[in-house]
Amino acid sequence: MTDETEEDDTTQQRSSRNDGVSKNKGKGFKGDKAKRALIGAGGRILFYPTLLYNLVRFKLQSQFRWWDQIDEYLLMGAVPFRKDVPRLKKLGVGGVITLNEPYETLVPSSLYSAYEMEHLVIPTRDYLFAPSIVDITLAVNFIHKNALLGKTTYVHCKAGRGRSTTVVLCYLIEHKSMTVAAAFEHVRSIRPRVLLHPSQRKVVEEFSRLQSPLSESTFIATSGDIVS
């Protein structure tokens, strides 16, 4: 693992047009816009300090893993650095889903391409926000397509706690026939620090209802920590 950074390269990224806010929210409210702007500014300020904190924990605590294998063809974890790309390739990764905003992204799409990895970019604001149902569906289909080809997909956000968990849960719900509760417990048993914000839980439950309207899709949050 390395802590070197690299300028963002957005020219070759397959990117979602929306900003990751649920379409069910009210639109155009000045308070919501101010809140988003404030959280966005705070996220930029906190990005490198929190990234450094995670790196220190990774180096000092053996149980603090940068990524974890959730399913046969599915890895999820924290933001990768450039030197991680060859390691991911050796692990059989053929696709990467980035749920970070551009300022949080440390590996350009061109580098993934050089290692024959597809790169799906779904920019989603940190802390309080979730990908839309449309983007989650795109991500789930991407993971499933790679799995059918025997390729592993790496799903990541900044710390591998909230945004990436949202997508991974939805994949398990659709393609492994899990309930929301079962999917969450499965992921948490492998990566104990995962945590969903209420907006992320809501979109996972909505996705589950769309897959099976009669399915049970409620689970209890276990902590109020900041997520990413």
From Swiss-Prot:
Gene disruption: observed consequences: No visible phenotype in the double mutant ptpmt1-1 ptpmt2-1. But plants lacking PTPMT1, PTPMT2 and PGPP1 have strongly shorter roots associated with a defective order of columella cells in the root apices, with stronger effect than in the single mutant pgpp1-1.
Reactions that this protein is recorded to catalyse: O-phospho-L-seryl-[protein] + H2O = L-seryl-[protein] + phosphate; O-phospho-L-threonyl-[protein] + H2O = L-threonyl-[protein] + phosphate; O-phospho-L-tyrosyl-[protein] + H2O = L-tyrosyl-[protein] + phosphate; a 1,2-diacyl-sn-glycero-3-phospho-(1'-sn-glycero-3'-phosphate) + H2O = a 1,2-diacyl-sn-glycero-3-phospho-(1'-sn-glycerol) + phosphate
Key words of the record: Hydrolase, Lipid biosynthesis, Lipid metabolism, Phospholipid biosynthesis, Phospholipid metabolism, Protein phosphatase
Pathway the protein takes part in: Phospholipid metabolism; phosphatidylglycerol biosynthesis; phosphatidylglycerol from CDP-diacylglycerol: step 2/2
Tyrosine-protein phosphatase domain boundaries: 66-213
InterPro entries per the UniProt record, alphabetical: Dual-sp_phosphatase_cat-dom (IPR000340), Prot-tyrosine_phosphatase-like (IPR029021), PTPMT1-like (IPR044596), Tyr_Pase_AS (IPR016130), Tyr_Pase_dom (IPR000387), TYR_PHOSPHATASE_DUAL_dom (IPR020422)
Keyword match Thylakoid: no
Enzyme Commission no: 3.1.3.27, 3.1.3.16, 3.1.3.48
UniProt-annotated catalytic positions: C157
Motif annotated as Glucan phosphatase signature motif CXAGXGR, chain positions: 157-163
One GO term (biological process): phosphatidylglycerol biosynthetic process
Positions annotated to bind substrate: Y48, D126, K158, A159, G160, R161, G162, R163
Region (Disordered), start-end ranges: 1-30
Molecular-function GO terms, alphabetical: phosphatidylglycerophosphatase activity; protein serine/threonine phosphatase activity; protein tyrosine phosphatase activity
Biased amino acid composition, Acidic residues: 1-10
UniProt cross-references to SMART domains, sorted A to Z: DSPc (SM00195)
Reported function: Exhibits phosphatidylglycerophosphate phosphatase activity. Involved in root growth and columella cells organization. May possess protein phosphatase activity.
Family per similarity comment: Belongs to the protein-tyrosine phosphatase family. Non-receptor class dual specificity subfamily.
Protein name, as recorded: Phosphatidylglycerophosphate phosphatase PTPMT2
Organism name: Arabidopsis thaliana
